[in-house]
Amino acid sequence: MAALMILPASMSARKKSSDIKVISYNIRLGVAKDGTNSWEYRYPASAMMIMDQKPDIFGLQEAYDFQVKYLEEYCEGYKSVGVGREDGKHEGEHMSIFYNKKTTKLLKWGTFWLSETPDKPSMGWDAACFRTATWALLKDKASGKKYYYVNTHLDHVGWEARKNGMKLIVDRIDNINPKGLPMIVTGDFNMTYDRPEFDDRKKMMKNAREEAAKTDHHQTFNGWGKANPNSIIDFIFYKGFSSCPVYETITKPYMERKFISDHYPITATLVF
């Protein structure tokens, strides 16, 4: 793939020592035949968005191995963890977590499947696809504070899979975070926030869109301009942070592309 033609002049993020900037980005699977919206046309704009926004961490949904490798190559200073959902290695979509090596240290990570057998590649309940969640224990280098980050993509068909997948994530959070460190959960949840499947999540975590001092209520699924304007199905949840000053749906064009995916990326700044 060709290198990016133009990148923002400054690649190093300037951040307050207690801030974490996170992005959730359903990148749209790279094998989809979307005409001029296919990956072959929009891949430079995806990298441009990351380098422009300069997050400390970001989570991808629907990313194939070659998309992950492309962003690692062209988003200077970022490294990722995650596995393909089909085989636990490279095949299928990755729920990758990227981190900025200048601001963030990776301590440990893992992936589990949203199924009755979460420790091996498997499809759960009434799901149409294998579904996973990737988690990481990270350390903010500026403040020295540790936190957990979970990135996921719930099923687009099965309501039981969404309900039970959500419960499994909540249960796993308790297991992997016994000390109650700050926690961030991002993803494409394939349902709106008024669904009862979110009830347990609402009790334990805050929704950045609703809590931020500066926010918006823009749709997150755009369907290449054809989606319902109320399609808010991507979320950033958090707990253990003192505040969320900014939440934003990233709708600005990059490299003259109105859409860099069929979902808009979303971002939030969280303060310890």
Model-derived features with residue positions:
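Active-site-proximal beta-strand elements of phosphoester/diester hydrolases
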Residues: D19-V31, M95, L107-F112, K145-D155
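Acidic/histidine-rich helix-loop elements
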Residues: S24-P44, H90, L114-A128, D155-G158, ...
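Structured beta-strand-rich core segments of catalytic domains in phosphoester-bond hydrolases
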Residues: I57-Y148, S243-I250
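Metal-dependent phosphoester-hydrolase catalytic domains
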Residues: E160, N164, I173-M183, M191-F272
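Catalytic metal-binding/acid-base residues of hydrolase active sites
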Residues: R28, Y64, H153-D155, F189-T192, ...
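Bacterial N-terminal signal peptides
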Residues: M1-P8
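Active-site neighborhood of phospho(di)ester-bond hydrolases with catalytic His/Asp-centered motifs
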Residues: F58-Q61, G82-V83, I184-D188, N207-E210
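N-terminal, active-site-proximal structural segment of metallo-dependent hydrolase catalytic domains
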Residues: S10-Y74, D87-G92, K167, F272
